[in-house]
């Protein structure tokens, strides 16, 4: 979601993005904005994304270029707000843009992205209907984003320390882990955790005082705040915490790529869900290449290798899920029965909500620091 995206992102995310720098950049070239597009060929395909988040995998860019003749050029952002600003200030520059679903409708309303002709997407019918047909991506009978990957913001634990897999969010408040809990410093995410732990809807908690009190109860538990996947991995490797909030795709990479003793949990109370989509920028100068690129990105061919090689969020393409190895994280954990029903997909926040959540979290942090 990095909406809180693995994204966050999210690799946020919703951590994603919460997002990685694992991809080779030898083929996918970065440039720094409108000024550096001067002199580029008409066939150049301009992609705006988090750095290291799938679309700039060197092998994939090379394969796509060989097949289509479309040269892929990347530009990057470090936050959703920066992404929106780049689209606003550089009209007619970009072709494909990665947008967390929370921001898709806003981008469409502002005229920053255009409808996608889904008849040109060969993988359309294989996309998970719950994500593909979401009102976050579709409005007025038109599709403004193609669901690409999804993930969960929940928690992961150190399997060297905790021998029995926890099934409740209350493990974060368990006195046996006092001084051994890691927590991401993000107001929206913090309020969402507090809401879920108090039995409320994280998108619209009715009793923010209950959320505040639950978060204040973290005081004896906290070891440290964290902000990036790399930081999380270093803390875990340094044995700084037993359990910590985390992103699903990042947990898979921590275990697979860095061989850390990590297991991800989606508790019985539920967890934060997010998904990212690929959109066609308004006035895209190379729309034909853009649609081919989006179709390739959502294909099983791309996704299975991406996930197998470095680890990725879960695919929105059900056919891709079926082609993953039997022991793959995104089949064993993310594909377990009833998973979607246990997720609270984050909805777009109003400015008033964001302000309230930020003020609440800043107050809580002040108290926690005393």
Each PLM stretch: what is its role?
Residues 1-15, 22-31, 38:
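N-terminal secretory signal peptides
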Residues 42-107:
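Early extracytoplasmic/lumenal segment of secretory-pathway proteins
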């Amino acid at each position: 979601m990095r909406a809180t995206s693995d994204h966050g992102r999210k690799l946020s995310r919703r951590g994603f993005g919460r997002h990685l720098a694992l991809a080779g950049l030898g083929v996918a070239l970065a440039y720094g904005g409108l000024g550096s597009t001067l002199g580029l060929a008409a066939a150049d395909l301009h992609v705006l994304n988090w750095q290291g988040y799938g679309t700039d995998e060197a092998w994939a860019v090379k394969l796509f270029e060989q097949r289509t003749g479309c040269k892929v050029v990347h530009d990057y952002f470090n936050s959703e707000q920066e992404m929106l600003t780049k689209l606003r200030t550089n009209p007619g520059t970009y072709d494909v843009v990665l947008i967390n679903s929370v921001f898709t409708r806003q981008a469409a309303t502002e005229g920053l992205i255009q409808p996608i002709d889904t008849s040109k997407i060969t993988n359309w019918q294989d996309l998970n209907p719950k994500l593909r047909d979401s009102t976050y991506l579709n409005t007025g009978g038109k599709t403004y984003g193609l669901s690409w990957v999804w993930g969960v913001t929940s928690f992961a634990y150190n399997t060297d320390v905790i021998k029995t897999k926890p099934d409740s969010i209350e493990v974060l408040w368990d006195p046996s882990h006092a001084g051994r809990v890691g927590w991401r410093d993000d107001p929206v995410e913090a309020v969402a955790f507090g809401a879920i732990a108090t039995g409320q809807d994280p998108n619209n908690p009715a009793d923010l005082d209950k959320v505040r009190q639950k978060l204040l109860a973290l005081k004896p538990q906290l070891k440290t705040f964290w902000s990036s996947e790399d930081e999380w991995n270093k803390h875990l490797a340094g044995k700084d915490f037993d359990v910590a909030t985390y992103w699903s795709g990042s947990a898979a990479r921590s275990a697979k790529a860095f061989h850390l003793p990590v297991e991800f949990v989606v508790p019985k109370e539920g967890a934060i869900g997010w998904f990212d989509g690929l959109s066609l920028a308004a006035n895209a100068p190379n729309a034909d290449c853009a649609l081919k690129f989006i179709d390739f990105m959502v294909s099983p061919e791309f996704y299975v290798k991406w996930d197998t090689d470095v680890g990725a969020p879960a695919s929105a393409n059900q056919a891709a899920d079926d082609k993953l190895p039997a022991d793959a994280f995104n089949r064993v954990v993310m594909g377990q029965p009833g998973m979607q029903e246990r997720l609270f997909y984050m909805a777009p926040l109003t400015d008033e909500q964001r302000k309230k959540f930020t003020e609440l979290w800043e107050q809580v942090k002040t108290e926690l620091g005393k």
